[in-house]
Amino acid sequence: MGKFAVKTVKTGIKFNLKAGNGEIIAASEIYNSKAACLNGIESVRKNAPIAPVEDQTAEGFAVEKNPKFEVYVDKAGEFRFRLKARNGEIIAASEGYKAKASCLNGIESVKKNAPDAEVVEEE
């Protein structure tokens, strides 16, 4: 089962969503309070399972309404996804993937793991 690992960093507090194997599948922005971070986790739990995928790498792609996963190519030419909440705010983002199929698998992993993932504190 996946978990949301909450971690304090120099500039605030953030979370990583980890799959059952411990691999980070999505990360948050840095929040200035634990309460805000926990709200972000709840937003991912609520939005990930219902969010459609907007593949911005496809020619003439269909624009989806928020909440949604956006698939895009970064400056390094790698595929990434970000999960946007209903208000359009980015609530989770991925690392870069060399293959689009791997990126899409990452989205499926977030959809599967987020709803029931436990929250744990990390050093």
Give, region by region, the residue ranges found by the protein language model.
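Intrinsic disorder/low-complexity detector
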Residues: 1-10, 46-75, 119-122
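Short amphipathic alpha-helical linker/capping segments at the junctions of internal repeats
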Residues: 33-36, 56-60, 99-102
